[in-house]
Amino acid sequence: MQKNIPSISCSPFPASRKIYQQSPLFSDVQVPLREISLTDGSAEKSLNIYDTSGPYTDNDIIIDITNGLPAISLPWLSKRADTEPYPARPVKPEDNGLLYDKTPPPAFKQKRPILRAKNGKAITQMAYARAGIITAEMEYVAIRENEGLTVKDQPKAQPDKICNGSIPEIYTAEFVRNEIACGRAIIPHNINHPECEPMIIGRNFRVKINANIGNSAVTSSMAEEVDKMVWAIRWGADTVMDLSTGRNIHNIREWIIRNSPVPIGTVPLYQALEKVQGIAENLTWDIFRDTLIEQAEQGVDYFTIHAGLRLPFIPLTIDRITGIVSRGGSIMAKWCLHHHKESFLYEHFDEICDIARTYDISLSLGDGLRPGSIADANDEAQFAELKTLGELTKVAWAKDVQVMIEGPGHVPMHKIKENMEQQLDLCHEAPFYTLGPLTTDIAPGYDHITSAIGAAMIGWFGTAMLCYVTPKEHLGLPDKNDVKTGVITYKIAAHAADLAKGLPRAQLRDNALSRARFDFRWYDQFNLSLDPETACAFHDETMPKEAHKLVHFCSMCGPKFCSMRISHDIRDTVHRKIKDEGMVAMAEKYQKNGDLYIDVSPPQKKIVNH
């Protein structure tokens, strides 16, 4: 993997450029795609692909992280006229974990209005969808999922496909609206994150992946924190969760959100815990509520809320091998046992939904009782919580709040499908968002692989988003190379699931790369791959010269034993044989008929007398 990485990763991919697809419905909607150019003379058209990297790979845009990214969704909000600016909650020292620190961290200087819904109005994408309104965000994600393909290029989705929620041949804004109205998909997009490029999470769309980042114990600059996010989205992360703890949380998050073109998620409980010096028993609803509003005003797009962990479920974990492995779950379990009462997240869930509704924040209902070992998979505690998450989903939907459900964890292959079936049944088809799952526990250092196996399977079965796992899982904090490895590993899993689901256009990139491989177009092979730099570097290790990029063999087989070169020879031989046989057949026909021109007049019809 790449070792020397610039502070902000802004360069475009090889043979690629950013293009923008204009919406036919909204004049102010232009959807970014990545166009990969292929070798001249190959008779191959350039390929447009889904792109998560934002403006950072656009050569025409100057990146200045002190100013943040363009606020692309502000015109859409202005036209809808159902939001209003208001005085923001003042930043407190404890927001940054600075109770005893006299030196504040650098704050993001560029200020903008803080927005909220007018007069308690529901301004969520679910509310619009249920009202039959197609928003700019819905049109945006439809174009994005199609990779620029338009309705005229493919048949329209059949109405019955929209009704039963299956995958259409082409995505339309109406299909997107229907999926959101049914709760099968969400567009996580806080109105206070106008820099975000809308994306959709749902099982009838591309499988998405999330990358987790967090502040280091020693941070050199805010640029370093922003670059963690930029690095993750460069390699394909569809969303990023900021799991920072300790000091500077508020300011770090502000820098990340202002510079992020993808949705940002958090676990608000982590910051709330910092405000009580890490003592779980001292947490209160008021502190947690204040933290939600703080993050909502900054623009966090989705909250992980561990509201499904209830007091009666805690004893169900006693006989587990690994107990409660969720950090948020263990915090709330400790609080519940100390106070011997239901979680304040469960008891105040209605109010949490009111806050989410005000800013269009999606709720990711956390699996605090997920299994942390394959021995604990699919147990009573896990499914008791899942049932509760289904009940909470209906509470959120009643307030037009978008919801997805978090899932395991550690699950052996033969138990994965049951997880998906239970989730669809108990949680009413809300999108599923899983961590892997890891399919075995014997491979520390390789858990990106053990989990990608489960991720590909559960993505095929219907999971909408996969949370990546890096090689450092269970061992330590991932560095940038680990993040890249984790993201690409999960892009492979997600793409494999898309192929198995029969997603429109999913196989086009595979086919283009396969043709390039068969034609020995080495640079096209590199440029079409998920990681062009590594593919090219591996080829350079044994065939480093520029002339080697033109040869019709690789170092694995050599010139005499290359199967594809032999296949070319076989194909040429067969074509010559067919051509020769055709000429012989024509000659025989000529000799038989004695004429160069063969009579092709239709035979006379027989007349039948009745």
From Swiss-Prot:
Binding-site positions, substrate: 212, 241, 270, 306, 326-328, 367-370, 406, 433
Gene3D superfamilies given in the database record: 6.10.250.620, Radical SAM ThiC family, central domain
List of residues binding [4Fe-4S] cluster: 554, 557, 562
Cofactor or coenzyme needed: [4Fe-4S] cluster
Binding-site residues, Zn(2+): 410, 474
Record-given protein name: Phosphomethylpyrimidine synthase
Function: Catalyzes the synthesis of the hydroxymethylpyrimidine phosphate (HMP-P) moiety of thiamine from aminoimidazole ribotide (AIR) in a radical S-adenosyl-L-methionine (SAM)-dependent reaction.
Gene Ontology BP, a term: thiamine diphosphate biosynthetic process
Gene field: thiC
Reaction equations catalysed: 5-amino-1-(5-phospho-beta-D-ribosyl)imidazole + S-adenosyl-L-methionine = 4-amino-2-methyl-5-(phosphooxymethyl)pyrimidine + CO + 5'-deoxyadenosine + formate + L-methionine + 3 H(+)
Source organism (scientific name): Bartonella henselae (strain ATCC 49882 / DSM 28221 / CCUG 30454 / Houston 1)
EC number: 4.1.99.17
Pathway terms, separated by semicolons: Cofactor biosynthesis; thiamine diphosphate biosynthesis
Single GO MF annotation: 4 iron, 4 sulfur cluster binding
Superkingdom of source: Bacteria
Pfam families: ThiC-associated (PF13667), ThiC_Rad_SAM (PF01964)
Cofactor note text: Binds 1 [4Fe-4S] cluster per subunit. The cluster is coordinated with 3 cysteines and an exchangeable S-adenosyl-L-methionine.
Segments of this protein annotated with the region Disordered: 83-103
Similarity annotation: Belongs to the ThiC family.
Protein keywords: 4Fe-4S, Iron, Iron-sulfur, Lyase, Metal-binding, S-adenosyl-L-methionine, Thiamine biosynthesis, Zinc
Subunit structure: Homodimer.
One GO location term (cellular component): cytosol
